[in-house]
Amino acid sequence: MANETNRQFEKVLAVCRELFSKKLYDYGASWRIMRPQSLTDQIFIKAKRIRTLETGAENLVGEDINSELIGIVNYGLISLIQLDMGYADNCDITPDKAMELYDAKAQVTLELMKKKNHDYNEAWRGMRTTSYTDLILTKIWRTKQIEELGGETKVSEGVDANYMDM
């Protein structure tokens, strides 16, 4: 079963990558301007919208939960890039470089997910889908707290680990 899950992880990541690539064509690396806190808030907005839709609110925008989840994955990977590079005052990297950075962060995150899937023995499969949303929101609040602490923690993993978990 773990091999099937790994294939599913890879398939979903390919969908996320394709959308990232298309948006990169449309907008360039405009996200380079965003500070880490702003990226955390973008992920928060998407997770909050998912929770709102899960609780039965009318969908006036028309985008479904899957599109918001793709956004969370992509903003999470962008956040990891920004943690390494810092933010910029303009779009200072080429689309090719942006894709290279995206692929590198995606690969590291994918490998972590595979390891966690193994160690947790596919526990995700027994979870309610709404629990994923709650976990993402929890990770966002943890990230915000760590950001407020200037990145310093006493025992917890850092912001990067939370972005990878989202």
Predicted regions and their residues:
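Intrinsically disordered, low-complexity regulatory regions
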Residues: 1-165
